[in-house]
């Protein structure tokens, strides 16, 4: 848990913001088991909907999915920038301070999302339950890059 790591690294006060109630309860139990209840306060709710008792020096964020803006991080970071961070334009106020998504055209003939395999008789092409995002690893030897990667998006947390 990031809050426990921050407290063990020397943070004097940590606000662990968690929107999921059962996860927040488990976080509180983990904090208590670690003996850090005097340093870490688990705040239940979306960071965009809660008010912290004070502005913070550092945001240690896990708001990034497979690509930079997948989990709505841009809105979340902008809100934290305006309401939660003492010095939001400083790079050392954010971990991470920047997130980039890189992409490249590729050929991966073995991936069924790019072309259904002949043996997949049960697949219903119109069914949303069988729609999968295409996530390819450049380390896969069956993947052939068609061009060098290029930056697709960049989210800089220090910019208003």
Placement of each model-derived feature along the sequence:
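Conserved SAM/SAH-binding loop-helix junction
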Residues: 1
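Class I SAM-binding transferase module
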Residues: 4-160
């Amino acid at each position: 848990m990031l809050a426990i790591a921050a407290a063990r690294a020397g943070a004097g006060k940590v606000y662990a913001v968690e929107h999921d109630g059962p996860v927040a309860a488990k976080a509180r139990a983990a904090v208590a088991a670690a003996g850090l209840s005097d340093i870490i306060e688990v705040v239940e709710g979306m960071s965009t909907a809660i008010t912290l008792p004070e502005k913070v020096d550092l945001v240690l964020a896990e708001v990034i999915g497979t690509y930079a803006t997948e989990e709505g991080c841009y809105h979340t970071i902008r809100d934290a920038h305006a309401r939660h961070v003492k010095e939001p334009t400083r790079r050392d106020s954010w971990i991470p301070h920047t997130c980039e998504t890189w992409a490249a055209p590729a050929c991966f003939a073995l991936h069924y999302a790019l072309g259904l395999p002949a043996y997949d008789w049960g697949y219903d092409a119109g069914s949303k339950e069988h729609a999968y995002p295409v996530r390819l690893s450049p380390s896969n030897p069956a993947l052939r890059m068609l061009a060098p990667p290029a930056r697709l998006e960049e989210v800089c947390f220090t910019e208003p």
